């Protein structure tokens, strides 16, 4: 989780009053922070990935003002509508299609603030941007450029500019090959014939997203006006990132000015988009979740402390206005969590359960531990990944047809979380892609649930436990993975039978499936699986440069 560093001095200056340091340390957990360390000068506080609005000191201060009742409700931001536009090139639709921009004027930047802005940007890159793949952010000195602005597709060999922290004019390809940031993020653009550029009205290149800004628009302590650009592959994530940046960087009296994005392939949009979300909270539901009696008036009071606007509709319902920077609020239950925060977790009465229980080991967890011990004994390292994935990651990149029995998300928030996985193989390949800069060989495994539709099941869905493992190395081949599977099966106390298997994710003729039979007749489970060498086209899709071998097994109870 992101760790935010700030000094007492800068926090108290923005807060408008000074607190005893020990009091601040005790308050921070009350606003969903985990204080990692502190001394007489600085605090290091950890915040959950669902609260990116806390990733700068301005967001922390905003919340503290509510908790201390120095301010209540949603802050009022000075937003000025302008005629400034950014026009999007049609060629970017299949490269990096979305952009959101705004201007922030009359900011005050000293050395500390400059450092904070850079750290804020990088935290957002990691949490919302998935290390710039989904979202990338550029923050520029507005006074060095002029509108209107353009989001263009540039020729990699014919277009050049001076990248940040450089003195030499480089082509876009040279930046990817020779610049530190270019080398690190080249994988995000290399497959395309043209690369995205942010250009001003005079033809000055401001940015090459998601790689690097121009030296021309570099921020300094003399900068007073900012141009913010956010580009990406998911319009919701792009919008969320810009809204959070605009809100946080304008907390200290700066003025936000809008920019309209003109698309050839999407509806035009004006940013920032501060149109709030409205959610109704029911007093009875809040009482049941929190475990105390709450009136509608008390709910309004607690929500205003947590920086929401709230209106009592009647004794049963409170209408809540959610600011756009609170991207963690999706449902009534999220509002109820904030009611508890505003009420104060330390104020909730402690109550012992009125029944006694006896703890026993969880048999499913014990089984997982056996699997973990076997795989660790084979020199594999365990990973954990999300169950949600997308059809592109799960099927297309593995050369598979989309299956009808997959479980899909009805209203996905992002394009890369649209279904529940049916296999663990793609999760392993994604992990290897993210870690391809690390030393080889890499040997990883995962134990996790997958799901698929079954109309005969009570819930119309079946969940199954699987284990998958993968190895990337220069010498990985079918013989290697066959030996690994044989060792795994033997260590589990089984014997196996092999058959030829054809799977489009694997090289034809270098893939097999197997069934198993326990050596101990009292073994309560069995398993089957498949293994082989990953197909070169799949390796290319995941930008992997060395052979990969993998196996996957599915467990079931003996009837």
Curated annotation (Swiss-Prot):
<dbReference type="InterPro" id="IPR045864">
    <property type="entry name" value="aa-tRNA-synth_II/BPL/LPL"/>
</dbReference>
<keyword id="KW-0067">ATP-binding</keyword>
<protein>
    <recommendedName>
        <fullName>Phenylalanine--tRNA ligase beta subunit</fullName>
        <ecNumber>6.1.1.20</ecNumber>
    </recommendedName>
</protein>
<keyword id="KW-0547">Nucleotide-binding</keyword>
<dbReference type="Pfam" id="PF03483">
    <property type="entry name" value="B3_4"/>
</dbReference>
<comment type="similarity">
    <text>Belongs to the phenylalanyl-tRNA synthetase beta subunit family. Type 2 subfamily.</text>
</comment>
<feature type="binding site">
    <location>
        <position position="328"/>
    </location>
    <ligand>
        <name>Mg(2+)</name>
    </ligand>
</feature>
<feature type="domain" description="B5">
    <location>
        <begin position="274"/>
        <end position="350"/>
    </location>
</feature>
<dbReference type="InterPro" id="IPR005147">
    <property type="entry name" value="tRNA_synthase_B5-dom"/>
</dbReference>
<keyword id="KW-0460">Magnesium</keyword>
<dbReference type="GO" id="GO:0006432">
    <property type="term" value="P:phenylalanyl-tRNA aminoacylation"/>
</dbReference>
<dbReference type="InterPro" id="IPR004531">
    <property type="entry name" value="Phe-tRNA-synth_IIc_bsu_arc_euk"/>
</dbReference>
<dbReference type="InterPro" id="IPR022918">
    <property type="entry name" value="Phe_tRNA_ligase_beta2_arc"/>
</dbReference>
<keyword id="KW-0963">Cytoplasm</keyword>
<dbReference type="InterPro" id="IPR005146">
    <property type="entry name" value="B3/B4_tRNA-bd"/>
</dbReference>
<dbReference type="InterPro" id="IPR045060">
    <property type="entry name" value="Phe-tRNA-ligase_IIc_bsu"/>
</dbReference>
<comment type="subunit">
    <text>Tetramer of two alpha and two beta subunits.</text>
</comment>
<feature type="binding site">
    <location>
        <position position="338"/>
    </location>
    <ligand>
        <name>Mg(2+)</name>
    </ligand>
</feature>
<keyword id="KW-0479">Metal-binding</keyword>
<feature type="binding site">
    <location>
        <position position="334"/>
    </location>
    <ligand>
        <name>Mg(2+)</name>
    </ligand>
</feature>
<dbReference type="GO" id="GO:0003723">
    <property type="term" value="F:RNA binding"/>
</dbReference>
<dbReference type="GO" id="GO:0000287">
    <property type="term" value="F:magnesium ion binding"/>
</dbReference>
<feature type="binding site">
    <location>
        <position position="337"/>
    </location>
    <ligand>
        <name>Mg(2+)</name>
    </ligand>
</feature>
<dbReference type="GO" id="GO:0009328">
    <property type="term" value="C:phenylalanine-tRNA ligase complex"/>
</dbReference>
<dbReference type="GO" id="GO:0005524">
    <property type="term" value="F:ATP binding"/>
</dbReference>
<dbReference type="InterPro" id="IPR020825">
    <property type="entry name" value="Phe-tRNA_synthase-like_B3/B4"/>
</dbReference>
<dbReference type="Pfam" id="PF17759">
    <property type="entry name" value="tRNA_synthFbeta"/>
</dbReference>
<dbReference type="GO" id="GO:0004826">
    <property type="term" value="F:phenylalanine-tRNA ligase activity"/>
</dbReference>
<keyword id="KW-0436">Ligase</keyword>
<dbReference type="Pfam" id="PF03484">
    <property type="entry name" value="B5"/>
</dbReference>
<keyword id="KW-0648">Protein biosynthesis</keyword>
<dbReference type="InterPro" id="IPR009061">
    <property type="entry name" value="DNA-bd_dom_put_sf"/>
</dbReference>
<keyword id="KW-0030">Aminoacyl-tRNA synthetase</keyword>
<dbReference type="InterPro" id="IPR041616">
    <property type="entry name" value="PheRS_beta_core"/>
</dbReference>
């Amino acid at each position: 989780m992101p760790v935010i560093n700030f000094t007492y001095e800068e926090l108290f200056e923005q807060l408008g009053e000074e607190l005893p340091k020990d009091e601040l340390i005790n308050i921070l957990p009350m606003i969903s922070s985990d204080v990692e360390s502190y001394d007489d000068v600085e605090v290091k506080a950890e915040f959950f990935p669902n609260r990116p609005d806390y990733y700068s000191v301005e967001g922390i201060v905003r919340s503290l003002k509510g908790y201390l009742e120095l301010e209540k409700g949603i802050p009022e931001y000075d937003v000025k509508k302008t005629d400034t536009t950014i026009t999007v090139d049609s060629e970017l639709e299949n490269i990096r299609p979305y952009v959101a921009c705004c201007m922030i004027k009359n900011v005050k930047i000293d050395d500390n603030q400059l450092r904070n802005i850079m750290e804020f940007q990088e935290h957002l890159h990691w949490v919302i941007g998935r290390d710039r793949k989904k979202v990338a952010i550029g923050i520029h000195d507005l006074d060095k450029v002029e509108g209107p602005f353009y989001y263009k597709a540039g020729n990699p060999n014919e277009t050049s500019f001076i990248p940040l922290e450089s003195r030499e004019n480089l082509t876009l390809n040279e930046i990817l090959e020779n610049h530190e940031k270019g080398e690190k993020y080249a994988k995000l653009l290399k497959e395309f014939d043209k690369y995205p550029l942010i250009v001003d009205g005079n033809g000055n290149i401001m940015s090459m997203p998601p790689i690097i800004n121009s030296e021309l628009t570099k921020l300094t302590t003399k900068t007073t006006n900012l141009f913010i650009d956010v580009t990406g592959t998911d319009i919701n994530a792009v919008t969320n990132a810009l809204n959070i940046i605009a809100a946080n960087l304008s907390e200290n009296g700066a003025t936000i000015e809008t920019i309209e994005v003109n698309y050839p392939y999407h509806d035009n949009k004006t940013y920032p988009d501060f149109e709030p979300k409205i959610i109704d909270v029911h007093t009875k539901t809040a009482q049941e979740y929190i475990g105390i009696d709450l009136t509608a008036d008390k709910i309004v009071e607690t929500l205003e402390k947590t920086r929401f606007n709230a209106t009592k509709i009647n004794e049963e319902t409170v209408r809540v206005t959610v600011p756009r920077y609170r991207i963690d609020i999706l449902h009534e239950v999220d509002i109820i969590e904030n009611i508890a925060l505003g009420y104060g977790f330390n104020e909730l009465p402690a109550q012992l359960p009125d029944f006694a229980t006896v703890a026993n080991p969880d048999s499913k967890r014990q089984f997982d531990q056996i699997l973990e011990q076997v795989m660790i004994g084979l020199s594999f390292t365990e990973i954990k990944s999300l169950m949600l994935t997308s059809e592109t990651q799960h099927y297309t990149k593995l050369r598979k047809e989309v299956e009808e029995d997959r479980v899909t998300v009805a209203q996905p928030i992002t394009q890369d979380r649209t279904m529940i996985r049916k296999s663990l193989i793609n999760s392993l390949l994604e992990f290897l892609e993210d870690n391809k800069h690390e030393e080889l060989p890499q040997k990883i495994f995962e134990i996790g649930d997958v799901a698929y539709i079954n109309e005969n099941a009570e819930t119309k869905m079946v969940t199954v436990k699987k284990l998958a493992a993968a190895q990337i190395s220069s010498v990985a081949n079918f013989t290697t993975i066959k030996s690994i599977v044989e060792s795994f099966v033997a260590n589990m106390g089984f014997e196996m039978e092999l058959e030829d298997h054809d799977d489009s994710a694997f090289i034809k003729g270098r893939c097999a499936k197997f069934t198993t039979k326990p050596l101990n007749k009292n073994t309560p489970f069995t398993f089957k699986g498949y293994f082989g060498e990953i197909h070169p086209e799949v390796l290319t899709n995941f930008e992997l440069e060395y052979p990969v071998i993998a196996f996957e097994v599915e467990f079931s109870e003996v009837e």
